[in-house]
Amino acid sequence: MEALRSRYLDNGMLDFLLKEREAGRIRNLGFSYHGDIEVFDYLLSRHDELKWDFVQIQLNYVDWRHAKEVNTRNTDAEYLYAELVKRNIPAVIMEPLLGGRLSRLNDHLMARLKQRRPQESVASWAFRFAGTFPDVLTVLSGMTYMEHLQDNLRTFSPLVPCTEEEFTLCLLYTS
């Protein structure tokens, strides 16, 4: 909370950003959440006043219910997303592949996914999981190679959301 206060509140930065949005120089004002749940909850508690246009959160099928196992500062994406939905704030999704880890699964898990959708990449499952939620505005993806871009285009054009069974299968990976 102290960093938020010193960087954005006490020095008038947030007020400045709000005025810039009001003047039309900022179209969409939001924030990217990284770790301190007190800051997240505080900023959302002020949504009626601040009118966030979006919030960027980390969401993938590991972080959905097991974020603290990845990093003790993290908060489960299920909670973060639910809080955004309550306030009708669109979500921008970062880390849908958990830093690439969800594109490189062990052979057993990969086989289970390939059995269901043989033509799809393992990465596409993580992207489809993140894109399944109705209040997701966009899913960010870091791409290194042309084949990553092509796979992403196949996955998102058009996006086929996970079925309930596929959603559950993704969550089984974390069990």
Model-derived features: positions:
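N-terminal pre-core extensions flanking Radical SAM catalytic domains
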Residues: 130-168
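Histidine/acidic-residue-rich catalytic or RNA/ligand-binding cores of hydrolases
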Residues: 101-110, 150-156
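Glycine/proline-rich, positively charged
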Residues: 1-93, 97, 105-109, 117-118, ...
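Short Gly/Pro-enriched loop/turn and capping motifs at secondary-structure junctions
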Residues: 98-99, 146
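Conserved small/polar residues in nucleotide/adenosyl-binding loops
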Residues: 173-174
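Short, glycine/charged-rich beta-strand-loop motifs at protein surfaces that mediate ligand recognition
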Residues: 113-116, 138
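C-terminal active-site-proximal or functional interface alpha/beta core segments in diverse enzymes
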Residues: 121
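Ligand-binding pocket scaffold of soluble enzyme catalytic domains
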Residues: 125
